[in-house]
Amino acid sequence: MRGGGTVIIPEGTFLTGSILLKSKVNLFLESNAVVKGINNLEKYRSISDLNQDEAYYKVKPRNWNKALLLGDQVEDVSITGEGVIDGAHIQDKKGEEGMRGPHILFLSRSKGIKISGVKLRRASNYAFMSYDIERASFDNLLVEEGWDGIHIRGGKDIRIRNCRFNTGDDAVAGGLWKNVVIENCYMNSSCNGIRLIMPATGLKIVDCEFRGPGKYPHRTSGEQKRRNMLSGILLQPGAWFPAFGEVKDILISSCSFDQLDNPFLVTLNEGNRGERICLEHIRGTRLMKAAASVESWGDSSLKDVRLSDVSLSYVGNKGQEIVGRTPSKPLTDYRALPCWGLYLHNLDRVILRNVRLVCERGKVSPASCFDNVGSVEIYNVSF
């Protein structure tokens, strides 16, 4: 493969439609450089135009797949520097929810991706969207406003490090992940911090801070301008559509959750199998509505679940408990549970070690509830 080099964007604001990314090319934004999306939807191209062979691109209409910067089957491509890529919150009346416009970045079937140092602001849909990428690193990014921050559907050997998210929708989302590390990131959202909607193996979420309420409103909430942060970590393959496969070798370590409705929810659905889920060194404060939970509602139990050195402090559930009743299968978010602290459903081989649950306001239900849980080991659990 020939060619390559660096394209330098100097100081200034540059209005543009779609830019096609090429292999072995680094797009470098100098300090105070702004690449801004033009308010003309006809100037944007769709990833569907570049890749018409993959059936799943056609799940969404062509205009949903438009982006400010996009590439298909590119390798060793990078976007670096200190500048800003501004999606400009351009609305498309024919888009999703009658308002979503182009993504900022969209890559498909690509390898060797590096995005570092830049600021992604006001995405008209997702800041970064991709299908089937490998060897991608996201480092020292600031992602603000818009909808999802980084959304990857099909990713292998991915690193998301030292990034700061202040998003209107999920900070990081997607699935079909293998060997993904999310490390030392700050997640602020008016939706969820990390939402997994398809299977994943070898996922590590380490040294991350999840803090609400959202700096920017959930754009889809319209006049409500809702800002409450829902869940910190939401692992729920199959909640939005059938997504068969495994959720295994998941490590969530040294993470903090503050002023969220719910700290974490792990749920398996039909066609999912799960094992070796570890949550350790977890601290949750000022949790507001729903208990943390690990659940399987599919055709098999979730095996080998370990919670170690976990401290969760709730300020009150505000009517989110259903005392004495078996909860329903969750849909796409947390829901009412029969306890205020920790709910486990259809699990096998569970270890709870140094787990502390605190409710700072009136208790109307048990601290925890175990439903169809076998082989439980409990060491130093208090509430």
Q: Over which residues does each language-model region extend?
A:
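Extracellular/periplasmic carbohydrate-active domains that bind, remodel
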Residues: 1-383
